[in-house]
Amino acid sequence: MQGKEILKQLSPYKQGKQIKDIQKDYQLDYIVKLASNENPYGYSKQVNEALSTENFDFHIYPDGYTSDLRTDLTQKLNIDESEIIFGSGSEEIIQLLCRSYIIPGSNVVMATPTFPQYKHYSLIENAEIKEIPTDKEGYHQLDKMLGSIDDHTAIVWLCTPNNPTGAAFSKEELITFLDNCPKEVLVVLDEAYYEYLHSDKDLDALQLRFTYSNVIVLRTFSKAYGLAGLRIGYGIANSTIIETLDKVRGPFNTNSVAQKAASYALKDQEFIQHTNQENYKNLTEFQHFLQRLGWGYYDSEANFLLVKTPISGMDVYEYLLRFGFIVRPGELLGIPKTVRVTIGKEQDMKELQKVLEQFDHELG
């Protein structure tokens, strides 16, 4: 018995080092995980307070329609209930999109480097992959991506801000792309880091569905909202796309706790504002530090920074582990001589700067 032939070419996702692993391997008490772009401030206190008063019937299947969260989110975003789908993280919706729209002989277009699961799930459906390198600053080259579309293109994957570079294209660039993109090609706009965008970079993406029937926008509660451990995200598009995805979605794909937690988190926008303010402050300070150190970096509109390292990113990663800092080496992201650093709390970032300064001094 064998699986699909393509699976012989793929590998399971390899997660980064976990805190418990570092504690065991290095005998450290002070450990800071800056590898997975999680929210260092956790999540809204209102979530814990509200959940403590809830009575969960764990022997009962969850609400397959995600009714309460659907109502809360559609009211906040001013969309119709038929225009939204929920998933176990927005990643599940990526998987649903591949299952729904990729047919034999299809190809998909994406940037490189970008979020790897676009490619992974597309390959599982036997799609041809067309990868267009980002420019030297880490931005999508939308004109070249447009030029690579042909009669067999099923999906174009756009990630903004892009993971791992942090770059975000402008609304004008996106509109030009969409105006020239064939209407039968699905355009997936992944805004996992949407809440971190500054207003001048906001694409007003939810309004695009009125003009472009081939666009779906993905967002998540895993990043700024801090609910990564509960796995819940959503997609917004016209009702025709949503109905198609619902046909391949599992009937109970988001759990009861995640649904409730997301609803309560959504109500606490002060927490999101605080997260944004602290992230911007600490990101800016870290950029200034790197400038003083003489290290380069990619501009970022998210809660992470892709840092250009003077030697192998893997070597920098290994060095930082010895001092309790977990980052993501660029060699695992397809960008050698870089590390991706999640922006942490102020004191943790100051400690990281001390270690990097020491490392740079040792390099001579």
From Swiss-Prot:
Biological processes, Gene Ontology terms: L-histidine biosynthetic process
Stored SUPFAM superfamilies: PLP-dependent transferases (SSF53383)
Cofactor(s) needed by this chain: pyridoxal 5'-phosphate
Molecular function in Gene Ontology: histidinol-phosphate transaminase activity; pyridoxal phosphate binding
EC number(s) stated in the UniProt entry for this protein: 2.6.1.9
Subunit structure, as described in the record: Homodimer.
Protein name per its UniProtKB record: Histidinol-phosphate aminotransferase 2
Protein encoded by which gene: hisC2
